[in-house]
Each structure stands twice: as C-alpha cells, then as structure tokens.
Amino acid sequence: FNTQYFDVTKKGELMLKEGNYQYNIAELVNKYGTTLEIVFPFIIEARVRNLIDIFNAYLKLNDYKGRFFYHYPMKVNQNREFVLPVISEGANLETSSGNELWIVKRLWEQEKFNSKIRVLCNGPKTTTYLNLIEELDRKGVMITPIIEEEQELEFFKRYKGEVGIRVDMDIKVRSHWDKKFNHFGFHEDELLKLGKIRNLGILSYHISSQIETVKGLVAPIKRAVMLYAKMREKNPQLDTINIGGGGGVPYEKKKFYTGKAAINRIVK
C-alpha cells in the first residue's frame, strides 16, 4: 500500500515523497534518534478521502438514496497526529473504551472538531465509560452508545439520545486472524425478541478483521439487512446499519480483491 509515496536514494536510503518535496528518512533518524515514529498526515488524509469518495460514487451510480458515513475506530491509533487528519477529511469517530472516549472529550474541549461529528461508543461499558457518554451527550456532542448486553439495555432506557444495538451474527468468514474471538452483542433470536427499543437508530455488527474475500464482507451485510427489515416493524426510527469488520491485506503476491470491488459489491 502507498508505494507511490516511497523511493530509495542513490545511497540506498529510504525516501518519502510529498508532491515535489522529498523526506530522507535516514536523515530524520540520525537527527532525532531512535525509536522514531513518523506520521504522514497527507497519506492518512488521502486514504480517508479516497474511501469516502469511492463509496459516494457507487451510491450515485446505483441510485441509492441513503448516505455513507465513515467512523474511524479510535482503537487503531489514538495519537492526535493521526486522529486530526482523519476527522479533517470528514470522518466521524468510534470508541471502544472509556479511555478512548476521554481522548475524544479532550479534543472536543480543545475545539479540535465541532459538535456535528458523530461518535459511536462500542465495547463493554464500565462506570467511567457510561458517565462519559452521558456527560458528552449533555454537552451537545452527538454520542450514540451501542448496546451490547442486557445490563446496558436496562441502563440506556433512560438515555435521551439515540442508541444503537449490536448483533452477534452466526456467520463464519475467512480472515487472516481465523480464530475464535470473544463475542459481543445479542444473538439474532434474542435481538428480535426485544421488541421496541427507545430511540433505536443503529443496527451494528462486527464480523472479523482482515477478511480475505469479498463474499466474507457481503454475506454479513445481507444478513444484517434482513434483521434490519424485521426490526423496523417495531422500531420505525431505525435508519442505519453500522458495518463492522476489516478489509483484507495482501501479504502475498497473489490475486486479491480491491477496495473498489468490495465497495461496489457492498453497495449493490
């Protein structure tokens, strides 16, 4: 990925290109020492912008009337040098712990983003996490907690803002990390028995990471759409499916699906 940005000097040193400017990585290491973390905001911005543009292009091509929103998962990298370029290109945020939401709170207090940004809160909800969710909601941040189990369902009955709910779908996909994970969310039959849920706006799932085939990305979406249709019978305000799962990485030199091909199938 991003090989167009990198090159090698005549001395065999790694070099990075930003437009017509060049950074010699070896010189930076010699200047600042090791270990050295180097972040390239323009690459991050380009990747996010490209993702959003491709989705929007296929939505238009297929005459789909809905909208696409990208939520950056904070668990990937919480450094502000990484997060700020992401949200500068229109990304929303997704947290999975109280610590990550605290970082969101600090960025909001420093006025690094406006209150129109939407924050999805996944993961087990500790007392600290729950308190932060309620605090930021009171302060006007668009916070949507994703309910993962019975205790959370009971707690958020008094929550005035929008909520989502997570389904643990019984679907197996091929992924690079093809092993058993801890499961979160309600099983499909449990979910359908819940009936009406106050302020339910999102049906959420996370199927796996580094999914190796397009079929592995599309199959859970088809299942989610079926559940979505059934849940809307008692929850007409439900209007969003949160697609959770990671695209594959081609570790070997063999034919692999492209991001465009995957997005095209997802939209169709």
PLM regions: where:
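A charged N-terminal "starter" segment
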Residues: 1-161, 165, 193-199, 233-235
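A short small-residue
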Residues: 24-32, 202-208, 244-251
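Glycine-rich tight-turn/loop motif centered on a GG-T
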Residues: 33-35, 115-119, 138-143, 175-186, ...
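Conserved radical SAM core fold
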Residues: 78-82, 126-128, 168-182, 207-212, ...
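Short beta-strand segments
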Residues: 120, 146, 164-168, 204-206, ...
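Conserved strand-turn element in the central/C-terminal portion of the radical SAM core barrel
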Residues: 142-143, 201-213
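Metal-dependent enolase-superfamily TIM-barrel catalytic cores that perform enediolate-based chemistry
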Residues: 152, 182-195, 216-226
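C-terminal active-site-proximal or functional interface alpha/beta core segments in diverse enzymes
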Residues: 213-268
